[in-house]
């Protein structure tokens, strides 16, 4: 049967109503029309009655007119998948946007897939080493797990996700997928050029590239921002099922997925829920997050940045994502104001791997001791603010001194932030991190000044910096 053809009856911003004479397209079907020479894809969202469907546009609708013909593709949005997508940048509907010609593959896959069945899923408790001290020690990531980076505006989510790409994706033997969801175009451009510089993308020989990029940035209509995370996820699923290896899936930013869903929901006339979000918030998030999973064929390790509106972790959008994650790294404005980067909150960040049977007794005990000292320092801060340090007992003074050293030792220079800090990035092996913090907690370095612990890698650098500081002071 020939594909059904309809006519546009109404255009309301990113929402388009299309009337079909006989055969109505199904919900989630992709419709196509020609907008001034450009292919415009619409996705069916509602059946309105009288043979009319309401669809969401995946690109700008300026130029559409009533009466214009629209064709039903008879299936959901499908994108090119497989090795031909490596080294390429695609948009939400799988069109290349890197000016390197079409994606050379006939293999396509619908962006709407069922989550793997319960029997197909697999879990692992293997630690994914990142080389970042505060993460490896206090909230370790699981291979094949879901990781969330939570933070307000400007506390360093994107820098941290870039550093994780730098540390993990470069040494990672499998494939990576990066989905830029509703973030700055400049950051997407910077990331692309950084990947070329570090040979993760090889422009002259794309088959040697290890990453596929999918962008739906801030300037795109809400339909594109709502669906681009699914486009990236579809690529990652295909790599997992085809290669059977561990696929890395980076999303920046998952909040924009929710935000776009809220815009679309309002355009479709649904009654808003708490704080103006869509009533289907938990369903939308669950449908996507359940697909990001490890199966017996291979695994997906996902790192998702989550913007926290007004630094409020109880906002429905970040609160809904918490339930789906294996590890949460919370970035704190108070810590970033101290100049400590990465501004990870060591007391708020969590991981399901925080268990002596997974990490081993030594790692677990050191992590808990570090958190214990920091927690004691936090509870003493009110007393210090009112009465000053002199009113503390000798034991508490020692706790505060160690806590301040630990706090500074949890900072670390990043490769991707070299342009801001002027110092080379450092990666610290997990064994060295555990050993160093064990010694600091035990008081072996009580004689060193706290300034020596700031923005360094391992403990040897602390000693060298302390000597340098002593020499400069002499």
UniProtKB/Swiss-Prot annotation:
Its GO CC terms are:
plasma membrane; proton-transporting ATP synthase complex
For this protein, the record's Gene3D superfamilies field holds: 2.40.10.170, Bovine Mitochondrial F1-atpase, Atp Synthase Beta Chain, Chain D, domain 3, P-loop containing nucleotide triphosphate hydrolases
What domain of life does the native source organism fall in? Bacteria
| Binding-site residues for ATP, renumbered to this chain | 151-158
> Where mainly found?
membrane
- UniProt key word Transmembrane helix: no
Catalytic activity line of the entry: ATP + H2O + 4 H(+)(in) = ADP + phosphate + 5 H(+)(out)
**Localization (cell):** Cell inner membrane
Q: Which PANTHER family match?
A: ATP SYNTHASE, ATP SYNTHASE SUBUNIT BETA, MITOCHONDRIAL
Q: NCBIfam families per the record?
A: atpD
From the Swiss-Prot or TrEMBL record, give the protein name.
ATP synthase subunit beta
What broad taxonomic lineage does this protein's source fall under?
Bacteria, Pseudomonadati, Pseudomonadota, Alphaproteobacteria, Rhodobacterales
The gene name on file is atpD
